[in-house]
Amino acid sequence: MDLLQRAGLVVGLWVTYHILLGTYNVFFHPLRRFPGPRLAAATQLVNVYYIIRGINCKYLYELHEKYGDVVRTGPNELSFRTASAIRTIYGGNPGPDDTFHKNMIANIQETGDSDNLFFATGQQHNRYRRLIMPVFAERTIQGQGPMMQEYCSQLIQGLRNRCGRGYFPTQDGVVDIVPWTHFIISDILSHMLFGSGMNCLLNGDYHPWVMAGYKALIESTYIEAAHRLRPYHRILEYLLIPTRLRDGFRVHSAVSREKLQARSKEAEPYQFSLPSFTSESLSEQELFDNINVIATAAGETTSSALSAIMYYLTANPAAYDKAVTEVRQAFSNEAEITAASSASLPYLKAVIREAFRIRPTIPVGLHRLTPKGGREIDGKWVPAGTWISVANLAACRTSSHWKEAGRFIPERWLGDPEFASDNRDTSVPYSIGVRNCIGMSHANTQLRLILSRLLWNFDFEACPGNADPYDYLEYGTWQVEPLKLRVVDIRGQPK
């Protein structure tokens, strides 16, 4: 047998193996009775295709609309969309025998022994959370109020300059608001983590650290797609990840490490660590890894949420008018708008909640594994080791949970009896349970304060041609597109 014949035999055996494996997955696998497309049941190639195209969340939404509350989306994978499933999977008993642990294959890591909060499991995760939580405590957040106010003022001045004819006469007051949402969130976040901002607002431009974080988030989604096709994931990482994204992790990590080292030399103790590297503190590497992953995740999700809120407000004049009226009637001058006082605006809070519902910041599911012995989820028995998740977009946009699900209606969060049938427990933008978002309060505080000051200082009007944020591509979170608004300065002096 010559070399060509041997190669043909190997290829033939490989193809035969995968045909037999696909046949087993469809007809004999323990999940065979769950509804879903047969091709997806046979192979992970279907999921990989939709992930790489950036439309996985919409694919899952369509599957749930067709097949119902539980769908088999892969050979060993189920997707849910009910409040019951959310409580069981994410909010259950945190004991070692009952925990729905993270699916480490879908989440890139080889094991749960990790140097960061996002991938660590068990006692390691509990330790990280206990040590990091004080940074995001309410008292700490209120103490950061003056810092956030300073960056809000820089944002106001930046928009004031660009909407005024004296600086940019050809723009006719039209500003793409998306970069500015990135600028302010990145400056606040970097100041919180490193003690100084990245000067995005002052320069009116992206810092390389911000762009690198954006690339890293997309790159991680491609890596997840590749890892779904083990043992071929290493070669697929090389083939799938676009060249333009390959330096994301490297650049972001390098800048973060440089900033962290500079901060450690300051006399002021670093707020994110304890005084000494004992068993009850974060090691230098743990500190770096946790800061890096928090910066990547928090920056993109919060800025994406802020731009989406601005879109839905300006696209819905009635909601916009109510939000503007509430802000301008609640305060007699801008100095009264603080991190604390902006929390007393019920309609603005409803606007934020509704934006999180109609376009969840994390639209896909957070992957978990069923524990040993299997578990009942939403009335269905699910075998141990099954990949499970709740598809956030599907849960938040289905008419079976929400009246007028596709419309932006903040009143549904204010006790309007017309929406009494809404299943509000299916909208959990920060997840629930022991692994819920540690920065939830911080993100909400930023959003309320920034929006309050924007609506106090400016009138906004949507320009034609803006894409609905629901139509954006999704790689971990949404890939925002330009959002052009006509901005009218109602407080500043004419230039």
UniProtKB/Swiss-Prot annotation:
Q: Which domain of life is it from?
A: Eukaryota
Main location group: membrane
Q: Name one GO biological process term.
A: biosynthetic process
Q: In which pathway does it act?
A: Secondary metabolite biosynthesis
Molecular-function annotations in GO? heme binding; iron ion binding; monooxygenase activity; oxidoreductase activity, acting on paired donors, with incorporation or reduction of molecular oxygen
The record's section on Gene3D superfamilies has: Cytochrome P450 (1.10.630.10)
Q: How does the entry describe its membrane topology?
A: Single-pass membrane protein
Question: Which chain regions cross the lipid bilayer?
Answer: 8-28
One of the record's GO cellular component terms: membrane
Which SUPFAM superfamilies does the record match to this protein? Cytochrome P450
Q: What does the UniProt entry say about where the protein is found? A: Membrane
What's the Enzyme Commission number for this chain? 1.14.14.-
Named cofactor requirement(s):
heme
Q: What is this protein called?
A: Cytochrome P450 monooxygenase FrzC
